[in-house]
Amino acid sequence: MAAPASVMGPLGPSALGLLLLLLVVAPPRVAALVHRQPENQGISLTGSVACGRPSMEGKILGGVPAPERKWPWQVSVHYAGLHVCGGSILNEYWVLSAAHCFHRDKNIKIYDMYVGLVNLRVAGNHTQWYEVNRVILHPTYEMYHPIGGDVALVQLKTRIVFSESVLPVCLATPEVNLTSANCWATGWGLVSKQGETSDELQEMQLPLILEPWCHLLYGHMSYIMPDMLCAGDILNAKTVCEGDSGGPLVCEFNRSWLQIGIVSWGRGCSNPLYPGVYASVSYFSKWICDNIEITPTPAQPAPALSPALGPTLSVLMAMLAGWSVL
């Protein structure tokens, strides 16, 4: 998650100026769902606690590490003991992430999920560690686009214990439009184009970008598919970065937070003119709900084991000149 220096892309100065003006003047819109329960927005996949309602209130200041309990649904996905991706808590047994985070290795025993974690080096009082029971990748993953269908459902072996630091997020679906939404991305990705990392969970406020402008920025209609959405602060050169993959993009609506996107791909942090591209949660919401409903709960649930954190974040990928997974 970085705010790199501005660069001039393939657009000319006049076209770029017009585009930036339109991005500022035109309020972004994105489809999202309003749940039918009183005073709650979005789909809740658990009945035990309210979704999207962190216990910590107040305004967040951009450019600083995220405070504890601000994003209680944040998950750290570990592969062979290292943080590689983010995710979000849906309910007591399910985590939402990106399919490409699990494509590298089909052996689910090598993956672990950490919740209630803010610092990758230090387990907090509410940090919990869970083993993976199964991973379900969307059937269209990489079918029509090199990184399309980039959604994964992760079922845990044991039940998540909710607390002020560990809570589920609400899911967005297509029934209601969010206009000029207050949206934030969170993760432990790179914090600069030089490859610097942070042990602290990072947060970044990002405006949503209308689909036509995202097509224009990427310069080719086939890059952005209907199952994707775009977000990025082009004027201030802010975007998600390598290592943020699978993490949530959430928007506030009536004091509830709806997850509208899953960090998926982009041109990398070195080129801020290209916004981050996210898997659209509203597009996949029915598939998510259907799979959670039909999948049996693991037998004999047991308490989570005590967390034992491995090395700090290690993002072992090169900055690609073209599009890349994040």
UniProtKB/Swiss-Prot annotation:
Glycans are attached at N125. Disulfide bonds join C85-C101, C183-C251, C214-C230, C241-C269. PROSITE patterns: TRYPSIN_DOM, TRYPSIN_HIS, TRYPSIN_SER. It holds the Pfam family Trypsin. Its EC number is 3.4.21.-. It is an enzyme of class 3 (hydrolase). Residues 33-59 form a propeptide. GO terms for cellular component: extracellular region. Residues 60-293 form the Peptidase S1 domain. One of its GO terms (molecular function) is serine-type endopeptidase activity. It is found in: Secreted. CDD domains: Tryp_SPc. The active site is at H100 (charge relay system), D150 (charge relay system), S245 (charge relay system). Residues 1-32 form the signal peptide. SMART domains: Tryp_SPc (SM00020). It comes from the Eukaryota. Coiled coil: none annotated. Its main location: secreted. GO terms for biological process: proteolysis. Keywords: Disulfide bond, Glycoprotein, Hydrolase, Protease, Secreted, Serine protease, Signal. InterPro entries: Peptidase_S1_PA, Peptidase_S1_PA_chymotrypsin, Peptidase_S1A, Trypsin_dom, TRYPSIN_HIS, TRYPSIN_SER. Belongs to the peptidase S1 family. This is Serine protease 38.
